[in-house]
């Protein structure tokens, strides 16, 4: 059995119009669903549940723009409808239709800028690597 390794920061990136525009050092993904219970008169427990819409929220840390993106003048504050691509050893996870909902920057003298971007995605798909 061959060990393929874990994702690295080069394996997590933002994509816009098929082009890699930034690499991401870390991420946290949360999925939620607005499911509801169906109650019936006279029943002590719900009789069914209805699947609701899914919502994908991602926290990205330490984004670094690619050289091409810097040359093209891409600004994180103006990004819309982009994708987050996460390459894992056995599959690729793509969050598409992304919009940012919060951008946080922290800076100190003689230290790197730490960025955190909160993203909401409309779709999540998995493909085999």
What are these regions (language model features)?
Residues 67-69, 127:
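Short, cysteine-centered beta-strand-loop-beta hairpins and adjacent loop/turn segments enriched
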Residues 39, 84-85, 125:
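Short alpha-helical interface elements
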Residues 1-64, 89-116, 129:
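Solvent-exposed edge beta-strands and adjacent loop segments
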């Amino acid at each position: 059995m061959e060990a393929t390794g874990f994702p690295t920061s080069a394996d997590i990136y933002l994509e816009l119009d098929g082009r890699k525009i930034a690499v991401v050092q870390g991420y946290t993904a949360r999925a939620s669903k607005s499911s509801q219970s169906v109650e019936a008169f006279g029943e002590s427990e719900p009789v069914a549940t209805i699947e609701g819409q899914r919502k994908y929220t991602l926290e990205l840390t330490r984004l670094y723009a690619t050289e091409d993106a810097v040359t093209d003048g891409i600004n994180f504050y103006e990004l819309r409808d982009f994708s987050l691509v996460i390459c894992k050893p056995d599959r690729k996870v793509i969050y598409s239709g992304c919009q940012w909902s919060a951008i946080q920057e922290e800076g100190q003298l003689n230290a790197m800028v730490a960025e955190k971007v909160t993203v909401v995605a409309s779709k999540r798909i998995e493909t085999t690597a």
